[in-house]
Amino acid sequence: MLVSKELNAAYWSLRVAFGLGPLIAGLDKFTNILVNWEKYLSPMAQHTLPISPTNFMHIVGVVEIIVGLAILFGATRVFGYIAMIWLWCIAANLISTGTYYDIAVRDILLGLSAYALARVTEARESVVFVEHGEEYRRAA
């Protein structure tokens, strides 16, 4: 399979988005500059957790930072799938709040996009690149 410039552009767009997005959101779990993240935690989760919502959000932040960095720095395929599952878990939490359905839908769609990133990465890992009319096979 040959990789076109268009497919490569889609891959890099998704990789940067799913690298920087979780990284920024993860860092913000410690500052709450973008939003107070605890408000998105369902009452059921708050009562079930053995730690405070603040501490839980700090753990979430660390996980998101790891996911973002892993996607940016080479473990894109595996962490694309992890991002998909993570986003769907966030959506399930949001739905269980009885509010924030719009954000839940967004996260479901972002999860599908993370799946696309993982699949495009798999395709790229076994392809021939074409640059200036020359074919180059990716090293195995």
Locate the predicted segments by residue.
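Extended, low-polarity transmembrane helix blocks
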Residues: 1-35, 50-62, 66, 72-140
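Perimembrane loop-to-helix junctions flanking transmembrane segments
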Residues: 38-52
